[in-house]
């Protein structure tokens, strides 16, 4: 983009400035070092777009406008992620009477394993529980120290 960078605030209502979860396996399994820039770009885009839904349609003709990467780069990234077993394609057929066959094929992509929407949501729930437990422990400890 042409706008100045603004750090994400992580607010639920501000979808475009929200954080997304990057599983620690991204680092421990060396994906950051072994994937090409094209695959990394697509991985990060799909991670962001699948925070609340299991897959996303990547329209190659729109990717330049939306993310600043070419359709060719998206295709290369998808192929590499599929070969690595990190992403899977889900075809959806929709009725379109203006199409030759009366249907149009849509390519949706979802991440697999620890990168999947479901797995990341589960990890966020566990982290949230742990954080709340730690906060309660700190509050109890502070209350006990205040009484002393």
Sequence positions of predicted segments:
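Winged helix-turn-helix DNA-binding recognition segment
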Residues: 50-105
